Amino acid sequence: VAICSPLLYSTVMTKRVCMQLVVGSYMGGLLNSLTHTCGLLGLPFCGPNVINHYFCDIPPLLQLACSDTHRNETLLLAFSAVIALFTLFVITASYMLILSVILKIQSDDGRKKTFHTCASHLTAITIFFGS
């Protein structure tokens, strides 16, 4: 909205919309973490309880379980794939819209300024998804 329709930004991005975006993000994170936590709570752990990692993550915990963890691994893969693909889709779609607006700008100077506004964020996104 800020690049494609800058004059409509304050009209579209009301406090209500911002709160809905924040609550939606938190609810998605809560659903993701609760699913994995409840799945891990149902697993029996026996034997060594030392995790040879810097921080406690789901795959090392699954290795300590002494029962079948296929369901947990499937949930982990599914949630990770859905979150990554949804994020990639939203970012790609927004940059396609931004690119179409940039290409419609008549002046070279205006096109350069608008592109340079997005270039640093686009570089960071490319590095993040590329690594």
Swiss-Prot record:
Q: Which residues lie on this side of the membrane: Cytoplasmic?
A: 1-16, 104-116
Topology check: give the Extracellular ranges: 42-82
Taxonomically, which superkingdom? Answer: Eukaryota
Provide a Gene Ontology MF annotation, just one.
odorant binding
Family recorded in the similarity comment: Belongs to the G-protein coupled receptor 1 family.
Q: State the function annotated in the UniProt record.
A: Odorant receptor.
User: TM spans, by residue?
Assistant: 17-41, 83-103, 117-131
Q: What is the lineage of its organism?
A: Eukaryota, Metazoa, Chordata, Craniata, Vertebrata
**Bilayer topology:** Multi-pass membrane protein
Q: Decide whether keyword Nucleotide-binding is in the record.
A: no
- Compartments, record wording: Cell membrane
What keywords would UniProt list here?
Cell membrane, G-protein coupled receptor, Glycoprotein, Membrane, Olfaction, Receptor, Sensory transduction, Transducer, Transmembrane, Transmembrane helix
Glycan attachment positions: 72
Q: Name one GO cellular component term.
A: plasma membrane
- Has UniProt tagged this entry with the keyword Cell membrane? yes
One of the Pfam families matching this protein, by short name: 7tm_4
Tell me the protein's name. Olfactory receptor-like protein COR9
